[in-house]
C-alpha cells in the first residue's frame, strides 16, 4: 500500500506549473490562483455524495450521535479546525463534533514521524472516545490510503457506525471501506505532492458543507443567522445582539435587554420578542419545535401553542 505513489493523481507532476520556479512572485500567485479555481468545480461534482453524508449526520445528531473526523497531517488538522469551530458557531458541546489526528495534540504543530502509518493508532483513538454505532466517522486523507484512517474506518464499520471517506484520488482504498465516498479530484498540485494546497482546500470546502448543512438540519440556523452562537467574548456578544436585531427588527437597546433576559440565547430572545412569551415559555416552545425557531413561530402563529 506504500508503493506506487506516482499512480496517485495528487502525486503527479502538474504540467501547468513545470516552470513555476522561473516566474516572478506575481506570476506565481496567478498560477496558484488559476489552479485553485479548479477546486470548487471538483467539489461541485461531489455534491450528491456530500448531501448523502449530511443526511446521515443529521440522523446521528437527532439520536445523540457524534460526528468524528479522522485524519493525519493537513487532513487531520483541517478536521480539528472544523470541529473546534462548531461550539462557538452553533452552540454544540465539545463532544458533538470531534477531530482526531494521527500523533495526537503534538501533531497539530509539527509532524510526528510515522504516526499516520499505524492502523492500530486509528483504532485506538476511536476506542479512546468510546465510538458507538450511533456515530458518524469521516476519514480524511488526500491520498485515500493513509493506514491510520484505513484502520479507523474498518473499526468503525465493525461496530456499526456510519463511515464516510473524503479523499482526492479515484478508487482509493478508503473509498472501498466507507459507506459514502466523497472524492473531489482536483488534479496534480502546483508543487507535486503538496496536498496541503488544492487537496487541502477541497477538503476544507467539503468539511464546511458537512457541518454547516447538518447544523441547519437540526435547527441551529434561523433564516441565515447563527442563532445558537455562544457569547463567549465581546465580539460574539455583539454578534448575538445584531442577530436578534436582524431577526426581529428591534433596536439595539431592546435587543440588549431581551438578550440579557434570555440568558444570552439568541433563539430564545427572538421568540420572546416576536411572540411576547416569557423566557420559560419561549424555552418550552423552542424545545417542542425541536430547536427550530421558524417552526416554533409557526406553531404559535397557527394557535397550536399560545403563550
UniProtKB/Swiss-Prot annotation:
One of its GO terms (biological process) is peptidoglycan turnover. It comes from the Bacteria. This is N-acetylmuramic acid 6-phosphate etherase. InterPro entries: Etherase_MurQ, Glucokinase_regulatory_CS, MURQ/GCKR, SIS_dom, SIS_dom_sf. Its EC number is 4.2.1.126. Residues 57-220 form the SIS domain. A lyase-type mechanism (elimination/hydration) is suggested for the cleavage of the lactyl ether bond of MurNAc 6-phosphate, with the formation of an alpha,beta-unsaturated aldehyde intermediate with (E)-stereochemistry, followed by the syn addition of water to give product. One of its GO terms (molecular function) is ether hydrolase activity. It is an enzyme of class 4 (lyase). It comes from Alkaliphilus metalliredigens (strain QYMF). Homodimer. It catalyses: N-acetyl-D-muramate 6-phosphate + H2O = N-acetyl-D-glucosamine 6-phosphate + (R)-lactate. Belongs to the GCKR-like family. MurNAc-6-P etherase subfamily. The keyword Metal-binding does not apply. PANTHER family: GLUCOKINASE REGULATORY PROTEIN (PTHR10088:SF4). The keyword Lyase applies. The active site is at residues 85, 116. PROSITE patterns: GCKR, SIS.
Amino acid at each position: 500500500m506504500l508503493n506506487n505513489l506516482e499512480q496517485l493523481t495528487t502525486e503527479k507532476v502538474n504540467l501547468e506549473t513545470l516552470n513555476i520556479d522561473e516566474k516572478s512572485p506575481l506570476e506565481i500567485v496567478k498560477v496558484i490562483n488559476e489552479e485553485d479555481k479548479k477546486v470548487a468545480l471538483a467539489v461541485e461534482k461531489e455534491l450528491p455524495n456530500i448531501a448523502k453524508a449530511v443526511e446521515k449526520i443529521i440522523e446521528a445528531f437527532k439520536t445523540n450521535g457524534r460526528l468524528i473526523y479522522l485524519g493525519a497531517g493537513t487532513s487531520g488538522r483541517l478536521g480539528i479546525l472544523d470541529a473546534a469551530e462548531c461550539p462557538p458557531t452553533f452552540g454544540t458541546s465539545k463532544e458533538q463534533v470531534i477531530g482526531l489526528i494521527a500523533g495526537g495534540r503534538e501533531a497539530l504543530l509539527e509532524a510526528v514521524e510515522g504516526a499516520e502509518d499505524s492502523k492500530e493508532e486509528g483504532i485506538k483513538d476511536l476506542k479512546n472516545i468510546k465510538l458507538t454505532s450511533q456515530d458518524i466517522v469521516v476519514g480524511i486523507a488526500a491520498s485515500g490510503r493513509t493506514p491510520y484512517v484505513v484502520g479507523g474506518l474498518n473499526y468503525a464499520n465493525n461496530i456499526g457506525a456510519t463511515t464516510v471517506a473524503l479523499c482526492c484520488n479515484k478508487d482509493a482504498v478508503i473509498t472501498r471501506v466507507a459507506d459514502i465516498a466523497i472524492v473531489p479530484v482536483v488534479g496534480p498540485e502546483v508543487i507535486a505532492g503538496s496536498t496541503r494546497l488544492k487537496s487541502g482546500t477541497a477538503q476544507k470546502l467539503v468539511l464546511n458543507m458537512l457541518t454547516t448543512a447538518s447544523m441547519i438540519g437540526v435547527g441551529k440556523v434561523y433564516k441565515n443567522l447563527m442563532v445558537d452562537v455562544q457569547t463567549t467574548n465581546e465580539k460574539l456578544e455583539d454578534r448575538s445582539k445584531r442577530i436578534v436585531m436582524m431577526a426581529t427588527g428591534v433596536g439595539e437597546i431592546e435587543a440588549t435587554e431581551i438578550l440579557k433576559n434570555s440568558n444570552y440565547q439568541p433563539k430564545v430572545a427572538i421568540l420572546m420578542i416576536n411572540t411576547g412569551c416569557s423566557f420559560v415559555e419561549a424555552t418550552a416552545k423552542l424545545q417542542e419545535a425541536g430547536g427550530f425557531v421558524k417552526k416554533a413561530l409557526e406553531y404559535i402563529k397557527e394557535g397550536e401553542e399560545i403563550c
